[in-house]
Amino acid sequence: MAFGNEAFPIVLLCSLWYAISSSNNVIGKKILLDFPYPVTVAMVHLLSTALYLSPTLHVWNIPRMHSIPKSTFVKLILPLSFGKAFSSIASHVSIWKVPVSYAHTVKATMPVFTVILSRFVLGESQTKEVYCSLIPVVGGVMVATATEVSFDMIGLLSALMATFTFAIQNIYTKKAMRDLRLNHLRLLQLMAIVGSAMLLPFWALCDLRRIIIVIQSGEQEMLWLLVILTINGFLNFAQNIVAFTVLSIVTPLSYSVAASMKRILVITVSVVLLRNPVGVVNVLGMLVAIFGVFLYNKAKYEANRRKHELPIVTKHPPMENNIKNNHIHYHLV
């Protein structure tokens, strides 16, 4: 009975996570098909994150942020915020140009970029199992790309750029939380605020005039568009919060399984509802890539577990553990 009581909230949260993520991706694609302004959609997502996190952090009683030195802000926060804005734009361009199913398959290459960047930026080497897990990831994405009916080079490059930027953010977010001793949600809020401010002039230059022309022409039902953009922004925020909550009550390995299942469901729902054409080999490539991501997460989990079993004494283990957990949260979402 106790097991049932513990399992019920996990199943409920995972179901909610899957439903929100699938809905958000389908709605996002629909918006970009009718309203092809990915910079505007990215701006809405950043503003929504900044806006909705304020009451959330207050309710959860997350400690307030202390003052950040100007040099640290310039060297760390500004690049991270720029990366968040850029990756959001690139991600939405990819969703606009290619099917959701294919964009999500390309984003499965995140472990490849993470391993390469960790090696050259941090000097970290991985276990043989981790390197081997990258083979199905790369192979699956290559098969999916070769057989993608609605292939678009801009969409592919945008998805790769978004994934590459996410990988860089994962590495430097760890450094930011270690150096600044910030809660990961406080850092996320700060990045969203600064990223919105950085994106504002580019948005005004790129989209504002064209949107005004569309409004004046009466081509779009603006009230409905504002409503659907607001819903999309809230769903994006809710998706991240639910994902953080799931990881806080399950092991990283269990989370990786849940995340892999979520990606499969998002791809399936998008194929069914958006009716983008896929072939058997194309689907096989997607599944192989997702399975490779699961193998990567499992290999990393085992490597970290073995590392923690070694008799290493550190001066501040609680803080280091906290930072590590925060990094895992950010990386997996």
Regions found by a protein language model. Name each.
Residues 1-333:
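Polytopic endomembrane small-metabolite transporters, centered on the Drug/Metabolite Transporter
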